Amino acid sequence: MIEFVKMHCNGNSFIITNDEKITKCSFEKLNQDKDLKFDQLLIYKEDDTSLKDLKIFNRDGTPALNCINGKRCIKALLNGDKPIAKNIKATVKINAYKELLDGFTYVDTTNYHIVWESDNLVDDDLENEYQKTGKFFNSDNFNLSIYKHDSDNKFLIRTFEAGVGETLSCGSGSSATAFVIFKKNPLLDKIFLNSSGGQMICYKKDDNKICSEANTEIMNKSKFDEREYF
């Protein structure tokens, strides 16, 4: 039996476990079970408080390099917080930033992000935009975030993640987008990013770091027989 915790951060959902046997399961079968469906699978060691050995897998089984919202959830879990934890902080280092053609911006948060501003966020076909962007840059190893200015220091955001699809929220995508917004609006040092899953607060922290805050929630603690998902 594999013990797990299912959590989410602004709707970005995770299965969290320290049992590596789960990697032998069919990710397709796991995601057909509503109690096990996830955006990312996180495998951590209980004594690894820095999460340096954290293993991250996308919904389609491909590995991911980083997962800010997932780490935020594990942090809340290790802190022994109640089912809903408020304003869990995370800091992201920006490894690279480059303005590209046609209004695109490349941001490296260990995960690779393409960010651009949209005039009509709600009606954008994000999957189609992701495919077109991938063809334009000849790559599928990136996440796409589009954003729109709402009012004052409030912005709307949508993110399409490689190996997952559109998610209700994305921590590294929001951090990358916040970095772009701060670059374009140097008078801002704090913004509110609203996705379909909820609100994330982002702050400037040094020249190459973004600090963010968001809530986490434990959805379920349970176990399952891995043999049913081979």
List where the protein language model places each region:
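A glycine-rich beta-to-alpha transition motif near the start of alpha/beta enzyme domains, typified by
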Residues: 1-93, 97, 115-230
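Surface-exposed beta-loop interaction hotspot
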Residues: 98-118
